[in-house]
Amino acid sequence: TICHIQISKTHGILKTCEENSCYKMSVRGWIIGRGCGCPSAVRPRQVQCCTSDKCNY
């Protein structure tokens, strides 16, 4: 799976991941992270996971 990886608040890259999923993590609507896999979330964080290429933009 090809996922967006968040390097900083304004910079990201695309990466081919071994995992079959990507995630986007947010707090109150603000995106705080993107990456490979599907980590569990701890409130107030929310995680959206997906399985297609570049789906976590």
Swiss-Prot record:
It should provide a tool for further understanding of the effect of M2R in various arteries and may position itself as a new drug candidate in cardio-vascular diseases. Negative results: does not show activity on the muscarinic type 1, 3, 4 and 5 receptor subtypes (CHRM1, CHRM3, CHRM4, and CHRM5) at concentrations up to 100 uM. It holds the Pfam family Toxin_cobra-type. The lineage of its organism: Eukaryota, Metazoa, Chordata, Craniata, Vertebrata. It is found in: Secreted. Belongs to the three-finger toxin family. Short-chain subfamily. GO terms for molecular function: toxin activity. It comes from the Eukaryota. GO terms for cellular component: extracellular region. Expressed by the venom gland. Disulfide bonds join 3-22, 17-36, 38-49, 50-55. It comes from Dendroaspis polylepis polylepis (Black mamba). Keywords: Disulfide bond, G-protein coupled acetylcholine receptor impairing toxin, G-protein coupled receptor impairing toxin, Neurotoxin, Postsynaptic neurotoxin, Secreted, Toxin. InterPro entries: Snake_3FTx, Snake_toxin-like_sf, Snake_toxin_con_site, Toxin_cobra-type. When tested on muscarinic GPCR, specifically antagonizes the type 2 receptor (CHRM2) subtype (Ki/Kd=120-399 nM). Ex vivo, it reverses the M2R-agonist-induced relaxation in rat and human arteries. Its main location: secreted. This is Dendroaspis polylepis MT9.
